[in-house]
């Protein structure tokens, strides 16, 4: 046996057997490059997932409350300036519209309602509008709310915190090294400053990544450890979708296996964080979507910002088929009747009912 092969097997043995071990950056690279068997990675990742989240999966539902009109130039985004993506632009929805969206999300079994607005960041007036909406949703529906509204200072974060916001999303998206390749209208440092502001206000930090934008394995490993240094409690892992109008020069090739390995990496580096399968799940994970839940404990359903996704019934069925259960905001479990029976309803499969007696 070669010295290199022996070292690789010893690394796999360590990750497999030492439940409380903390992986190094080198071990992270070996997870991504295939040196460690996928089943070994999943076994270790599942042990950590199960330790903190048991067999529960949290479903998040996005509400794109303002689309387009963005002055930023993030290369991955259909809403970026000069994108010519053909998306339907609209100003911020009214409080009543957003509230009704939240009502529907709760009916669908959402653990958290995620409000997303385009733009560099909210001004004072917009912050107050958002705070009013958040206050109503949390008080009247008892829902957990996450807001993604761009760059934020501590003063505005305090306003949102006072309204009941317990989670703010601001993705780092890629490594500091790779950031100039994807955006030139703001800096990586400005994004980390927003995380600092959110933390100082006492709001839980949600920050994640987009993989597949031409970054290296080292960049992905660096991102996982950077988020660990910020003690981020919720990490959405997006898989790049080449939407019309994007400006990513050399998108990477993402196989379903690599996507699962990436989720394992983020779980092993951030064992007690909520790891969420985000945009690109349907197209990149494909038949391994259910397998990915052995590393991740959360996912989005019912679509993304400008891309369709799996509907809630399909998502819930996949979760249950894999032996997991959808977790509700009160810690309970989504009732069984919202699953397979609805999936095979007459509306969805009329051919199954064509001989039904009237």
Swiss-Prot record:
Record-level GO BP terms: biotin biosynthetic process
Cofactor: [4Fe-4S] cluster; [2Fe-2S] cluster
Residue runs in coiled coils: none
Highest taxon in the source lineage: Bacteria
Subunit composition and interactions: Homodimer.
Function (record text): Catalyzes the conversion of dethiobiotin (DTB) to biotin by the insertion of a sulfur atom into dethiobiotin via a radical-based mechanism.
Entry protein name: Biotin synthase
Organism, scientific name: Leptospira borgpetersenii serovar Hardjo-bovis (strain JB197)
